[in-house]
Amino acid sequence: RLCSSDLTEYNSKQLHIVGLFIKKENYSDITEIMAESQKLKEESNKLLVKNLAKDGYILDYDEIKSSTVDGFVNRANIAAALMQKGYVSSVKEAFQTLLMSKFGYYVPPKRPSSLYIIERLKGFGSISVLAHPFLNMNEDELREFLPKAKACGLNATEAYYSLFDKAETELAEKICDEYGLLKSGGSDFHGATKPDISLGVGKGNLAIPTEIYKNLANCYHNFRL
């Protein structure tokens, strides 16, 4: 079973920490953590819509929310609404202009600490993974983060990812070996917000060996002994 805390923070950078093999008795704990994160995220999104309206970019937050599958609004939904209203020509343009924090409309929500989430997952007896490590960190920042994360219980880092090129994959593999971390992988499937990625199928020639899962599963079972 898998549960993820997709948005955590370290040194003001957004990191994605994934929890694997969450036990049923910990579902309520995870739900509580995620509910608080979602509350802060919604407050940020509502403020974003309010700030946009001040400069004439009028959006209906309730309408955006009702258009989502699960009732959770993210910036991709707001970007799509801006495009539908004709304020931008594409979702990409929205993210590169109005939705960037430097424009002043978007105020990032407070997020749980990455190290805190890793410690909680360790306390649950679950496996923690740093997903797509180069998304918001360069190599030096990653190397600064990993020793602290491993001390808190980090088990693995994603080495196989849809948007990694060959050099990034090889670097991620090397770093995993250097820090004694397991390798993980994923397509980064996010439903309708990433329509070009299917469940379990990434972009390009992404292929994740079954051995990757087996190593993670063995780590989980050994941890429980």
Predicted regions and their residues:
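Active-site-proximal helix-loop elements at catalytic-domain edges
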Residues: 142-160, 218-225
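Short low-complexity, flexible loop/linker segments enriched in glycine and/or proline
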Residues: 143-146, 172-175, 198-202
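Catalytic beta/alpha-barrel core
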Residues: 104-111, 158-162
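Conserved, well-ordered alpha-helix/loop/beta-strand core segments that scaffold catalytic motifs
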Residues: 107-137, 141-150
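Active-site gating loops and adjacent loop-to-helix segments of metal-dependent hydrolytic enzymes
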Residues: 7-42, 61, 80-103, 198-223
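Short amphipathic alpha-helical segments and helix-helix/interface helices
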Residues: 118, 146, 169-173, 213
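A metal-dependent hydrolase metal-coordination microenvironment
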Residues: 1-74, 152, 157-194
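Non-catalytic, well-ordered alpha-helical scaffold segments
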Residues: 46, 76-80, 115
